[in-house]
Amino acid sequence: MVRKITELEKVLIQKSKPPDRTSHFLNKAVKLGLENKYAESIVCLDRVIRINPKLAIAWYYKGTALNVLGQYQEAIICLENVHRNWCEAWNQKGIAYANLKKYFEAITCFEKAIKFDTDNQSAYAENKARVIKELEENNV
Protein backbone atom coordinates (compact mmCIF):
# COMPACT_ATOMS: atom_id res chain seq x y z
CA MET A 1 0.00 0.00 0.00
CA VAL A 2 3.03 2.28 0.18
CA ARG A 3 4.21 3.69 -3.13
CA LYS A 4 7.33 5.20 -4.58
CA ILE A 5 7.75 8.85 -5.55
CA THR A 6 6.30 9.65 -8.97
CA GLU A 7 7.95 11.61 -11.74
CA LEU A 8 5.32 14.32 -11.26
CA GLU A 9 6.31 14.69 -7.60
CA LYS A 10 9.98 14.97 -8.60
CA VAL A 11 9.05 17.81 -10.96
CA LEU A 12 6.93 19.48 -8.26
CA ILE A 13 9.87 19.38 -5.86
CA GLN A 14 12.13 20.99 -8.43
CA LYS A 15 9.55 23.59 -9.48
CA SER A 16 8.73 24.66 -5.92
CA LYS A 17 12.25 26.18 -5.73
CA PRO A 18 12.67 26.25 -1.97
CA PRO A 19 15.83 27.86 -0.55
CA ASP A 20 19.08 25.97 -1.19
CA ARG A 21 19.32 24.30 2.24
CA THR A 22 15.71 23.21 2.04
CA SER A 23 16.21 21.83 -1.44
CA HIS A 24 19.36 19.98 -0.39
CA PHE A 25 17.73 18.25 2.58
CA LEU A 26 14.50 17.56 0.70
CA ASN A 27 16.35 15.92 -2.18
CA LYS A 28 18.47 13.93 0.28
CA ALA A 29 15.32 12.79 2.11
CA VAL A 30 13.72 11.63 -1.15
CA LYS A 31 16.87 9.73 -2.11
CA LEU A 32 17.03 8.04 1.30
CA GLY A 33 13.35 7.14 1.07
CA LEU A 34 13.88 5.52 -2.32
CA GLU A 35 16.68 3.49 -0.70
CA ASN A 36 14.24 2.37 2.04
CA LYS A 37 16.21 4.33 4.65
CA TYR A 38 13.10 5.85 6.16
CA ALA A 39 14.46 6.81 9.58
CA GLU A 40 17.35 8.68 7.96
CA SER A 41 14.91 10.29 5.53
CA ILE A 42 12.82 11.55 8.45
CA VAL A 43 15.89 13.23 9.98
CA CYS A 44 16.36 15.20 6.75
CA LEU A 45 12.66 15.99 6.52
CA ASP A 46 12.70 17.32 10.08
CA ARG A 47 15.44 19.74 9.02
CA VAL A 48 13.35 20.83 6.02
CA ILE A 49 10.31 21.36 8.23
CA ARG A 50 12.35 23.42 10.71
CA ILE A 51 13.50 25.65 7.83
CA ASN A 52 10.11 25.84 6.11
CA PRO A 53 7.23 24.49 8.23
CA LYS A 54 4.70 25.29 5.48
CA LEU A 55 6.33 23.08 2.85
CA ALA A 56 3.54 20.52 2.40
CA ILE A 57 5.62 18.03 0.44
CA ALA A 58 8.02 17.63 3.38
CA TRP A 59 5.11 16.84 5.69
CA TYR A 60 3.73 14.40 3.12
CA TYR A 61 7.01 12.52 2.75
CA LYS A 62 7.50 12.41 6.51
CA GLY A 63 3.97 11.05 6.99
CA THR A 64 4.57 8.43 4.32
CA ALA A 65 7.89 7.38 5.88
CA LEU A 66 6.28 7.15 9.32
CA ASN A 67 3.55 4.96 7.82
CA VAL A 68 6.18 2.58 6.46
CA LEU A 69 7.85 2.45 9.88
CA GLY A 70 4.53 1.63 11.56
CA GLN A 71 4.28 4.95 13.41
CA TYR A 72 0.73 5.53 12.30
CA GLN A 73 -0.43 8.15 14.81
CA GLU A 74 2.62 10.29 14.06
CA ALA A 75 1.98 9.82 10.33
CA ILE A 76 -1.56 11.15 10.70
CA ILE A 77 -0.29 14.23 12.54
CA CYS A 78 2.18 14.96 9.72
CA LEU A 79 -0.40 14.41 7.01
CA GLU A 80 -2.67 16.98 8.68
CA ASN A 81 -0.15 19.59 7.45
CA VAL A 82 -0.68 18.74 3.78
CA HIS A 83 -3.07 20.57 1.45
CA ARG A 84 -6.65 19.38 1.85
CA ASN A 85 -7.02 18.46 -1.82
CA TRP A 86 -3.86 16.33 -2.07
CA CYS A 87 -5.35 12.92 -2.80
CA GLU A 88 -2.25 10.85 -2.05
CA ALA A 89 -2.01 12.43 1.41
CA TRP A 90 -5.61 11.35 2.06
CA ASN A 91 -4.67 7.85 0.89
CA GLN A 92 -1.66 7.70 3.24
CA LYS A 93 -3.81 8.99 6.08
CA GLY A 94 -6.37 6.29 5.32
CA ILE A 95 -3.64 3.65 5.43
CA ALA A 96 -2.52 4.92 8.83
CA TYR A 97 -6.07 4.88 10.21
CA ALA A 98 -6.66 1.38 8.82
CA ASN A 99 -3.53 0.12 10.54
CA LEU A 100 -4.78 1.66 13.79
CA LYS A 101 -8.07 -0.24 13.26
CA LYS A 102 -9.92 3.08 12.96
CA TYR A 103 -11.88 1.82 10.01
CA PHE A 104 -14.50 4.54 9.65
CA GLU A 105 -11.84 7.26 9.64
CA ALA A 106 -9.89 5.24 7.06
CA ILE A 107 -12.93 4.93 4.79
CA THR A 108 -13.53 8.68 5.00
CA CYS A 109 -9.92 9.34 3.97
CA PHE A 110 -10.09 6.93 1.03
CA GLU A 111 -13.34 8.56 -0.11
CA LYS A 112 -11.63 11.96 -0.08
CA ALA A 113 -8.70 10.54 -2.07
CA ILE A 114 -11.19 9.24 -4.63
CA LYS A 115 -12.94 12.61 -4.74
CA PHE A 116 -9.75 14.57 -5.42
CA ASP A 117 -8.10 12.22 -7.93
CA THR A 118 -10.28 10.97 -10.73
CA ASP A 119 -7.31 9.33 -12.48
CA ASN A 120 -6.34 6.90 -9.68
CA GLN A 121 -9.71 6.17 -8.16
CA SER A 122 -9.31 2.41 -8.52
CA ALA A 123 -6.23 2.28 -6.26
CA TYR A 124 -7.99 4.26 -3.54
CA ALA A 125 -11.18 2.26 -4.03
CA GLU A 126 -9.18 -0.95 -3.51
CA ASN A 127 -7.86 0.38 -0.21
CA LYS A 128 -11.38 1.35 0.80
CA ALA A 129 -12.67 -2.11 -0.18
CA ARG A 130 -9.97 -3.79 1.95
CA VAL A 131 -11.04 -1.76 4.97
CA ILE A 132 -14.72 -2.55 4.41
CA LYS A 133 -13.86 -6.26 4.12
CA GLU A 134 -11.88 -6.08 7.36
CA LEU A 135 -14.83 -4.35 9.03
CA GLU A 136 -17.15 -7.14 7.91
CA GLU A 137 -14.74 -9.88 8.98
CA ASN A 138 -14.38 -8.34 12.43
CA ASN A 139 -18.11 -7.62 12.78
CA VAL A 140 -17.41 -4.00 13.62
Regions found by a protein language model. Name each.
Residues 34, 68, 99, 130-134:
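Register position in tetratricopeptide repeats
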Residues 47-48, 81-82, 113:
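Canonical positions in the second alpha-helix
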